[in-house]
Design a protein with these regions (language model features):
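Helix-to-loop junctions at the C-terminal end of transmembrane segments
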Residues: 66-78, 267-280, 365
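Intracellular juxtamembrane helix-capping segments at the cytosolic ends
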Residues: 119-132, 321-335
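Helix-loop-helix hairpin linking two adjacent transmembrane segments in secondary transporters
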Residues: 134-135, 139-191
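Conserved MFS/SLC helix-loop-helix module at the cytosolic interface between two early adjacent transmembrane helices
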Residues: 65-101
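A late C-terminal transmembrane helix in Major Facilitator Superfamily
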Residues: 333-369, 376
């Protein structure tokens, strides 16, 4: 009899998997490229930091206007085609920015990055779940690690180039060349069928009843919005809160985000192992959202340097360590025939939150920074409530195989 502890994490589609993970590594670079090269680009386009901030906003716009479109395309024409579209858009950006003559064209290239991210998400997430049908949670949570590694590596590259007076453009051309290599690998790679093999499907939880879009579907989307908002609020406002209420200096307060990043990476690797062997994504989502809720309450009630540093680490672990990705995995289990559409809807709502939350927190900051932490607690609590709803519905919709001993 098969046991979960012997679950294989191998796949015959290894080249496709490498392409996807490597693309996410470079995607992590792409979303911070403009900010990391802000001074050089401001000089190039004869603008100021506000002008580059406007340029960066094009990434969010590109993502919002395209993600639903690519969800349909991915389900209809396949994952490879959509990922190739993403790579082409990334190539336009990385090779185009150094040669771009003005800010208007550069904004168009920033929009290309947002479009590329939409295409990569709607092709990459479903493809990983199809490559690893028995370990989809572990497969998608590693996406978070690859993005984080890219965002850790690129600032070091930019710093090295600045210290050695190397032209900033090489910092864009190098990722562009790597995307050329990914293109060649994609053309030779093999992708799985969008339908799970019957022999594999029999070992997975079987549907006992039809999932309800208005209940677990809506709850899953709300979970994604709440989870995203929980860590977004902390990463933007924790330093200011720590300075105002914990008496920390600016330099000390900024270090809270380093603890946040460490927590995020620690969670990714812990749960990548646990999800493969003994823990279901739905269990991980309930646990992490409960932990985030408790932590946000403690940060509000007992602000101190220790609490702010430890709280940032725990929020990074619980809210930014991959539960956004696990939410996609769980929602795709409920609606397996529309994985890319599910991903696009889920990620689009996160994009809307990315637009709305800064407006809300900006307003609250004028009233009192403590109310921003109250808002963060509210989002964490919403994530917990929706995670519990999805958890309870999971066992009504699915029949769990007797030989499956995963907790949750």
């Amino acid at each position: 009899m098969r046991t979960v502890t012997k679950l294989s994490f191998s796949t015959p589609f290894i080249l496709a998997v490498l392409c996807i993970y490597f693309s996410y590594f470079l995607h992590g670079i792409s979303v911070i490229t403009l900010a990391q090269n802000m001074t050089s680009l401001a000089e190039k386009f004869s603008t100021d930091n506000a002008g580059i901030a406007y340029l960066i906003s094009g990434i969010g716009l590109g993502r919002l206007i395209s993600i639903l479109f690519f969800g349909v395309i991915s389900d209809k024409f396949g994952r490879r085609a959509v990922i190739l579209m993403a790579v082409i858009m990334y190539l336009l950006f990385f090779f185009g920015i150094p040669a771009c003559p003005n800010l208007t064209l550069a904004y168009g290239l920033a929009v290309c990055v947002g479009i590329a991210n939409s295409a990569l998400d709607t092709g990459g997430y479903p493809a990983l779940m199809e490559c690893f049908p028995k370990a989809s949670g572990s497969a998608v949570i590693l996406v978070k690690a690859m993005v984080s590694f890219g965002q850790m590596f690129y600032p070091m590259l930019v710093s090295y180039m600045l210290l050695n007076n190397i032209w900033y453009g090489y910092g864009l051309i190098i990722p562009g060349i790597l995307f050329v290599l990914i293109t060649l690998m994609l053309l030779k790679s093999k992708f799985p069928s969008q339908l799970v093999d019957a022999s594999v499907a029999n070992e997975l939880p079987q549907m006992n009843s039809k999932p309800l879009v208005w209940l677990e579907g809506v709850s899953s989307v709300l979970f994604g919005v709440a989870a995203f908002s929980t860590f977004y609020v902390i990463v933007v406002w924790m330093p200011k809160y720590a300075m105002a209420f914990a008496g920390m200096s600016e330099a000390e307060a900024l270090k809270t985000i380093s603890y946040y990043s460490m927590g995020s990476l620690v969670c990714v690797f812990i749960f990548a192992a646990l999800l493969k062997k003994m823990v279901r994504p739905i269990w991980a989502n309930v646990f992490n959202s409960a932990l985030a809720t408790i932590t946000a309450a403690i940060i509000y009630l007992y602000p101190s340097p220790l609490v702010c540093n430890a709280g940032a680490f725990v929020i990074g672990f619980s809210a930014a360590g991959g539960i956004l990705q696990l939410g996609v995995s769980v929602m795709s289990e409920f609606f397996p025939k529309s994985k890319a559409k599910v991903t696009s809807i889920y990620m689009m709502m996160g994009g809307l939150a990315n637009f709305v939350i800064p407006l809300i927190t900006g307003y609250l900051s004028n009233i009192g920074l403590q109310y921003i932490i109250v808002l963060d607690f509210t989002f964490a609590l919403l994530a917990l409530i929706t995670a519990i709803i999805v958890f309870s519905r999971y066992y009504r919709v699915f029949i769990i195989p007797e030989n499956d001993v995963q907790f949750g």
